[in-house]
Amino acid sequence: MQYHLQVEPHRCAHRTFPSPMTDAVVASEYLDESAKWENFKLDPRLLQAVYQLGFEKPTLIQSNAIPLSLEDKRDIIAKASTGSGKTGAYSIPIIQNILSEGLSEHNIKSVILVPTKELANQVTKFIEKLLVYCNSITQINLATNVSDQVVVSLLSAKPEIIISTPSRLTTVLEKHASIVDLTTVTSLAIDEVDLMLSYGYMEDLQKLDDFLPIKRNLQTYLMSATVNDDVNDLKARFCTKPAIIKLNDNEENQNRLVQFYARTSEFDKFLFAYVIFKLHLIKGKTLAFVNNIDRGYRLKLFLEQFGVRCCILNSELPVNSRLHIVDEFNKNVYNLLIASDESTEVTEQEGEDDQEDSKPEKSKKKKGKKVDGEYGVSRGVDFRNVACVLNFDLPTTSRSYVHRVGRTARAGKAGMALSFVVPVKEVGKHKTATNPGAKRDEKVLARIVKSQSKNGFEIKPYQFDMTQVEGFRYRAEDAFRAVTSAAIREARIRELKNEIMNSEKLKRFFEENPQDLASLRHDKELHPAKVQSQLKRVPDYLLPESARQDPKKIGFVPFHKNKVHKNRKRKGGKKVDALKSFRQKK
């Protein structure tokens, strides 16, 4: 028998509170004001760590999931938006159960699976803070880039908690089955379940059947922002009589997120981006998504010619660099982050069009360079205080769109999403600016509008005032011509070399000198082949009248230079010889 629970968020004024989940904030409607942490009978050490993290009240998901898992020993399937406390809903009971069982000897007690290395790092950091007073419990993050020798050494110590991606864990188990014993595991948590399936981890999850005590002495947590039919396979495989908890917060998200789309030509994407960021039309931080790595560098090289600083996040960069970029973005070091969303999510629910359209893209991926298959930015990564999500390139599926725009309007804050859509008649007219996936933009937009309307969201068309924008076109064209394929290739090589050096050679130094880490920046100019410094200044005549400088405050500017100054420059005379003019005093 399954236990279903529908949870409604509070309809109250928005307040935000520190969250131990990610050191971010939790909106007040997600808090359960009637619950207290003491009601869960947590270990004093764990309770003290929770309070030290600044979380005074459990969230609705936590107040329902934690008692069911600790007292009733139920498997948990939870559906709730990002920022509602899902990470704490499974990590707190996992640690509590380990403490309750006692630690007479070290054994692997819990396995936490996440889809990306970035999310694995976030979960590791959070659990590390929960264990601040529980030094006897150890954890290991297998998703980091460490050698097999180091992994074997760490696993031989039998850490109580293992955090990993499914593929990394199965690889380690197959290579070192004699060292890693998972028969003692009592808790299994799978975070971002729907993304696990989209990333193709189903085969790896099936392999875990041979190593985990499935349905014998295993308590399972399946956590996701969306729960659909695809989750049924995992539910049947890992769960026994699960309690299903759903947080109905669509109305709250609808009030906070404003969505727009703008139909534009392929080159005008760059023109609009120049105007938006150079004139600071968006207040706050922006997360811009492109569909491949080259597009990200082309946009960065284009914008930096106008003095617009930004950094890039893609699968080519070392893991340590990616994690540092996310941390610095969350600390407001950068206001613009260009992220390459290279994942292609294709499911039966998207329909035949999605499957047909995505086949060529998949084949191209296989022929391309090897990239990190466990990289992901559109989902799961904790981007904080994002004011705007800019879909510079429209995603290939409506589900990918939902994941992208979910990076803003979080934790009770308002947000805006703007998507550039290329009409079919405009595709291919500007070869250099062409995005291969643009030919599907109209179809994808129709599916996005349809899926969003089902959930009560509206995507409004946005029309740029071209009379204000046209004046910037010739400058944009000049800058765009400087961004050649050779310039992009050189920029990728230069950036990769810099980041590898930062990631590998300086890793140990920064561990010993964390204060010096702040000096490491990722938004340095890469420079195209042709540098045009004059483009960094916007002439006054290009600005709207409201933004122009008042002529009365400029003062008098003569047409000719002052003649006095000219004459002074020409004057000079003969220099006095000090030896000839020297007179001895009598």
UniProtKB/Swiss-Prot annotation:
CDD domains: DEADc_DDX56 (cd17961), SF2_C_DEAD (cd18787). ATP binds at residues 80-87. Residues 344-372, 562-586 are annotated as: Disordered. Keywords: ATP-binding, Helicase, Hydrolase, Nucleotide-binding, Nucleus, Ribosome biogenesis, RNA-binding, rRNA processing. A motif (Q motif) lies at residues 35-63. Residues 562-573 have a biased composition (Basic residues). One of its GO terms (biological process) is maturation of LSU-rRNA from tricistronic rRNA transcript (SSU-rRNA, 5.8S rRNA, LSU-rRNA). GO terms for molecular function: ATP binding; ATP hydrolysis activity; DNA helicase activity; DNA/RNA helicase activity; RNA binding; RNA helicase activity. It comes from the Eukaryota. Residues 274-467 form the Helicase C-terminal domain. It catalyses: ATP + H2O = ADP + phosphate + H(+). Its main location: nucleus. It is found in: Nucleus, Nucleolus. Residues 344-356 have a biased composition (Acidic residues). One of its GO terms (cellular component) is nucleolus. Residues 67-245 form the Helicase ATP-binding domain. Belongs to the DEAD box helicase family. DDX56/DBP9 subfamily. The Q motif is unique to and characteristic of the DEAD box family of RNA helicases and controls ATP binding and hydrolysis. ATP-binding RNA helicase involved in the biogenesis of 60S ribosomal subunits and is required for the normal formation of 25S and 5.8S rRNAs. This is ATP-dependent RNA helicase DBP9. It comes from Meyerozyma guilliermondii (strain ATCC 6260 / CBS 566 / DSM 6381 / JCM 1539 / NBRC 10279 / NRRL Y-324). The gene is DBP9.
